[in-house]
Amino acid sequence: MMNFTLLTYLADCQPKVRSELEKFSKNLEEDIQQLREIGLDILVDGQDYRLVPMLPLLNPQQISTALFPYSIHYQPIISSTNEWILQNILSLKKGDLCVAEYQTAGRGRRGRQWLSPFAGQIMFSFYWAFDPKKSIEGLSLVIGLAIAEVLNVQVKWPNDILFDERKLGGILVEIANHKNGMLNLVIGIGINVSLSKQTEISQPYAEVCEIDPDVERQTLLPKLIQHLYTRLNIFEQNGIDEEFQQAWQSYNAFSNSEINVLTEQGVISGIEQGIDERGYLKVLCGNKIQMFNGGEVSLRKK
């Protein structure tokens, strides 16, 4: 288990003498090695140890105050925030969150691994419940739009967040097996804020620090969650109505673009026309509109 107390003491980027660090560690060399294995750079100069650059860890107490009455469960190092919510859902209320600095087994869409450098992203999952009689088609679009509105970036159907045509973040929605008469969901969100140069991601990616060099996760996180919950409450009342369709289209990275839709049956080309009241994608193919739902469908610009 990683020594988070030691990391917290090192996080300010100031040199720390070995004898001080040994108050927090029974085996300093082993603990330092574990920190390095998750991508942290710790310099050693004689008896002095220094973590570079400074690591701006989240302050869970301040976040809890900003998001009252929701409970914030701060798990600095965790396998998966979605998994934590799923395992603890019986003791949670709607809107309660799990927030992490680092995930060892984060998941993305279609079971892909979600890579998370330490304290370089906003990573959280929360519990939400819907009336089972109401449709939640288009839910991931609602989440994506809420994030795009706060960050002033773009969405790509069905659930990618883009800046400058590069992926800034992703969304994972899972159904929870919790028998309380509601449709129970775990919603996970990961957003790149400031990644180290050593981060190995196989596709072009963007970071919030490109948009706002002074960004602080501490203030951005509650702002995102508050707006997200506002959008979810509107969605519960109105669904994917005309107002939402227009708002989503205004942030759509592929609006009226020539695209290829990659399906299990093959590639379909056309011009993207936005979404309908179910959140389905509308594509003009020749003189006919074809509809696509999420599932195993991907989009590419031509």
Swiss-Prot record:
GO biological process, one term: regulation of DNA-templated transcription
Pfam family, one: BPL_LplA_LipB
EC supergroup of this enzyme: ligase
UniProt GO MF annotations: ATP binding; biotin--[biotin carboxyl-carrier protein] ligase activity; DNA binding
The EC number(s) this enzyme carries: 6.3.4.15
Domain BPL/LPL catalytic: 62-236
Disulfide partners: none
Statement: the UniProt record of this protein carries the keyword Cytoplasm: no
Reactions that this protein is recorded to catalyse: biotin + L-lysyl-[protein] + ATP = N(6)-biotinyl-L-lysyl-[protein] + AMP + diphosphate + H(+)
Gene Ontology cellular-component terms listed: cytoplasm
DNA-binding stretch(es), residue numbering of this chain: 14-33
Binding residues for biotin: S80, T81, N82, Q103, R107, G108, R109, K167
Function according to Swiss-Prot or TrEMBL: Acts both as a biotin--[acetyl-CoA-carboxylase] ligase and a biotin-operon repressor. In the presence of ATP, BirA activates biotin to form the BirA-biotinyl-5'-adenylate (BirA-bio-5'-AMP or holoBirA) complex. HoloBirA can either transfer the biotinyl moiety to the biotin carboxyl carrier protein (BCCP) subunit of acetyl-CoA carboxylase, or bind to the biotin operator site and inhibit transcription of the operon.
Name of this chain's protein: Bifunctional ligase/repressor BirA
Native source species: Haemophilus influenzae (strain ATCC 51907 / DSM 11121 / KW20 / Rd)
